[in-house]
């Protein structure tokens, strides 16, 4: 698995030129799927070159859906950086919540609408993560799956999105690498070499290697830690493919909690 260049949708303030570069990379990687394949994601044939990665994405999606389905309150969910919409559709079908998927990539939003347009309580909007909120319903829950690595200032984006949530609302980060202190430089070099081999070296400047420290100052909890003993044991079991990336829940504090913290 090429963990330094994982699959996913870009959701960062960007120009049409940057989106074109992103699309070029996905074409060269062979990650552009026809509608019939997108409709079945995350299930892909064994012969698909990214079969192992999609098994990991299925694992993280299952965990997320199980968590959301157990909510005691009605949910309004926004997936930021939804790409072709497969995860938004999975959530809408399984959780019984209203779901809005947003992405800056017009091509991917068009495909999401074609493939999943008939799913109840699901819609897709071309929108920038930094501008999210104005024309959209206020969510109780925000999902960023394989997104944060395309954002240069991750803490600023997290603060902005948390401000869009009500007190107690949840933001979920998943399917993105977060590095221990000292690991990011080597990962950055691997990504630069990867995009150079692919023939699109400019993409390396937009693929960011965040350390766990970006979570400092947030009310963050690891709901899946791939480095935990139980996760490492599960990864060795036959037939299992747990996600190698963490799943992190960040809550917007209740106003009373925030006031106490600020004193």
Can you describe what each PLM-predicted range is?
Residues 1-45:
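N-terminal, positively charged/glycine-rich alpha-helical extensions of SAM-dependent methyltransferases
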Residues 53-73:
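Conserved alpha-helix/loop element of class I SAM-dependent methyltransferases that forms part
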Residues 81-83:
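Class I SAM-dependent methyltransferase "Motif I" SAM/SAH-binding loop
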Residues 86-131:
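Class I SAM-dependent methyltransferase SAM/SAH-binding core
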Residues 141-154:
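A short SAM/SAH-binding and catalytic strip from SAM-dependent methyltransferases
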Residues 155-170:
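A short glycine-rich, Lys/Arg-flanked "PGG" loop and its adjoining helix->strand segment in the class I
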Residues 172-195:
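Conserved class I S-adenosyl-L-methionine
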Residues 203-223:
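Short alpha-helix
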């Amino acid at each position: 698995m090429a963990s330094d260049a994982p699959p996913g949708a870009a959701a960062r303030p960007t120009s049409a030129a940057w989106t074109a570069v992103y699309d070029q990379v996905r074409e060269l990687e062979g990650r552009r799927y026809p509608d019939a394949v997108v409709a079945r994601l995350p299930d892909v044939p064994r012969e698909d070159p990214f079969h192992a990665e999609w098994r990991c994405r299925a694992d993280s999606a299952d965990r997320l859906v199980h968590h959301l389905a157990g909510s005691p309150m009605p949910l309004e969910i926004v997936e930021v950086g939804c790409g072709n919409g497969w995860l938004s559709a999975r959530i809408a079908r399984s959780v019984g919540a209203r779901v809005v998927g947003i992405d800056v990539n017009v091509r991917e939003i068009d495909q999401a609408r074609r493939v999943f347009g008939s799913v109840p309580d699901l819609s897709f909007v071309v929108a920038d993560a930094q501008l999210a909120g104005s024309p959209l319903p206020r969510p109780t829950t925000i999902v960023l799956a394989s997104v944060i690595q395309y954002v240069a200032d991750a803490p600023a984006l997290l603060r902005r999105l948390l401000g869009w949530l009500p007190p107690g609302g949840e933001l979920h980060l998943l399917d993105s690498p977060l590095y221990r202190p000292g690991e990011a430089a080597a990962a950055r070099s691997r990504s630069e070499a990867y995009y150079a081999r692919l023939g699109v070296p400019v993409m390396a400047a937009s693929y960011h290697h965040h350390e766990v420290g970006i979570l400092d100052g947030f009310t963050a909890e690891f709901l899946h830690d791939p480095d935990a003993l139980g996760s490492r044991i599960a990864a060795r079991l036959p037939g299992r493919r747990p996600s190698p990336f963490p799943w992190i829940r960040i809550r917007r504090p209740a106003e009373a909690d925030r006031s106490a913290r600020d004193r």
